[in-house]
C-alpha cells in the first residue's frame, strides 16, 4: 500500500504525536538551536531513511547492510574531528572496528560469498551511514543541554516536516485510508511509529548521553546478526557457520572498541 519513502512521514509523524501525547510540553529554543534541530531531524530521520531506502533500490540488501554498518567507525572519526569535549579513544577502537566490520560482512553474506559492487547504490548507503554518524554527534550535544524526551520529540517533528518534500518529489503523499481499512497495515504502522521510532530513539538518545556516541554506536555492529537470529526464529531461515563466526567477531570487536573508550 505504501512505498518505503511514503512510510517515512507516516512513522515520523506518529512518533512525534506519541511523544507529544505523553508530554504535551512546549519546547522553546533559540533560533540557532532550532536550525540545528532541523539538521538533526534530517540526518537522523528523513534523509537517513530516504538514502537507505533509495540505496536498496540500486544495490543489494547485503551491500546496504554492510555499508550502513560503517556508521560506528564514521562516528569515531567525526567524534575526533568535531566533538567539543572529545571522547578519549585508543588504538583498540580502530582494531575493534575492523574486527566488527569483518564480522558484519560474514553475517550479511551468511554463506553466500556473493558481494557485487554497485557504485550509485553503494555510495547512497555510505551516505546514509555518514548521516547517522552526524546525527549521533549532534544529538548528544543537545541531550546534554535539554531534556532528552523533548529533544527526541523535536527531532521527529523536523524529520516529519523535512520528509514531506522528499515524498512530494518522488512517490506523492500517501493516503491514510489503508491505515484504517487494513488491520495488518495499521499494526505495522503502530509498531514502526511507536516502538521502532518513539521508544527506540528515546532510549538510544539516553544511551548517547550516558555512554557516549562511540560506545553506543558500537552496538550497531550487532544489528545484522540480530536480524539473522530473528529470521531464524520467526521465518525459519538458516544460520550458516559464517554467521556464527561473524557474531563472534562482532562481539570481540565491540569488546575491543569499548575497552578503548573506558576512562
Protein language model regions, located:
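Membrane-interface helix termini and inter-helical loops of multi-pass transporters
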Residues: 1, 57, 107-120, 170-184, ...
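Hydrophobic residues within membrane-embedded alpha-helical segments of Major Facilitator Superfamily
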Residues: 14, 43-44, 51, 74, ...
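Hydrophobic alpha-helical transmembrane segments of multi-pass integral membrane proteins
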Residues: 4-21, 39, 93-102, 120-127, ...
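Helix-helix packing/entry segments at the starts of transmembrane helices
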Residues: 9-10, 45, 49, 64-70, ...
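Hydrophobic transmembrane alpha-helices of multi-pass small-molecule transport proteins
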Residues: 19, 38, 77-78, 89-110, ...
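Helix-loop interface residues and adjacent transmembrane-helix termini in multi-pass membrane transporters
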Residues: 1, 58, 86, 145, ...
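Specific transmembrane alpha-helical segments of multi-pass solute transporters/efflux pumps
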Residues: 20-68, 102, 106, 193-211
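Specific alpha-helical transmembrane segments that line the substrate/conduction pathway
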Residues: 6-17, 44, 53-87, 91, ...
